[in-house]
């Protein structure tokens, strides 16, 4: 599957996607701008890939500086094995679940550079995968799904500075959505966001919220993101330092995530109650990177509707068995979603499965257990002498 993007299936509440992110458009008036932003949410129209020669950035959308954003060492996983080249295949599935509306969005692009008309280097394959879990409406999730990849490919530092570019794309998307909401109040909503970029052997995951990415490394679950919950000690300290509070597990008693894009309509979230910036809810993503090796089998990305009922290792075990049976990431993502619904997930459920190898995951060989004697050599001699005496 080279690229997928979500469209609704009204009969069963599930979705699959077709189309590409839109070209950024210029506009000269507020009404025209609102129309442009509204067009972005029309899932039925055909969308063209970004072309660098046609990119026009609105004057207010200046690049957000992220020079102070870094990838923390504790969230960096390195595995040095050369000569491995990932062979990506992806599949995605989404279901409305027990909710009255679908607020999730996702994007899978197995050939990211080519899809956006960019020249690829000799670094190897490039791919982009994203899951966006909206709340209070679908608009923020759909906006992030369209705009994060757009800002990535527009950035002059892409792909040489992937970490900085990915962080900047989240923050620019948040700023752009604020402008969109100021032009059309009906767009007011928020979304968590997780984006994974594969470039050569480098996998970079940016997360803001409680979507999660889990890598299967020889059947072992490697979490490539951390859930940003208000009750997390690190997030709680940051929230309280920004003038917010955590009540009953909710940020300011209203939101069950500590990081998200949008939510500008919620008082005291993106701005402090005194009107100053840097409120307790931030869109800044947390990044994790790793170098892929032949031990890495597949990546699972899911919204919290998946992880509410799956432990990370449990999901890897489940997906691994399915891929061993059919080696089809689309079927595997569908089976993950269906299993989450069977386990009574109460949310929209979206899963993306990215296979990193052409062949299915191999059977794991259990290590042979070493036999430890419970008797010393002297004790064995004494026992043998005793048994010999019984025979006489």
Swiss-Prot record:
Q: Name one GO biological process term.
A: regulation of defense response to virus
Q: Name one GO cellular component term.
A: cytosol
Report the CDD domains cross-referenced here: PP2Cc
Gene3D superfamilies listed in its UniProt record = PPM-type phosphatase domain (3.60.40.10)
* Chain sites annotated for binding Mn(2+) 2: 133, 304, 347
Region Disordered: list its residue ranges. Answer: 1-26
Keyword line: Hydrolase, Magnesium, Manganese, Metal-binding, Protein phosphatase
User: Which SMART domains does this one have?
Assistant: PP2Cc (SM00332)
> What GO molecular function annotations does the UniProt record carry, in alphabetical order?
metal ion binding; protein serine/threonine phosphatase activity
Cited InterPro entries:
PP2C (IPR015655), PP2C_BS (IPR000222), PPM-type-like_dom_sf (IPR036457), PPM-type_phosphatase-like_dom (IPR001932)
* Domain PPM-type phosphatase as annotated: residue spans: 89-356
So what EC number does this one have?
3.1.3.16
According to its UniProt record, which reaction does this protein catalyse?
O-phospho-L-seryl-[protein] + H2O = L-seryl-[protein] + phosphate; O-phospho-L-threonyl-[protein] + H2O = L-threonyl-[protein] + phosphate
Cofactor binding note from Swiss-Prot or TrEMBL: Binds 2 magnesium or manganese ions per subunit.
Which cofactor names does the annotation list?
Mg(2+); Mn(2+)
Pfam short name (any one): PP2C
Q: Where does Mn(2+) 1 bind?
A: 133-134
The UniProt similarity line reads: Belongs to the PP2C family.
Q: What name does the UniProt record give this protein?
A: Probable protein phosphatase 2C 22
Q: Which organism is it from?
A: Arabidopsis thaliana (Mouse-ear cress)
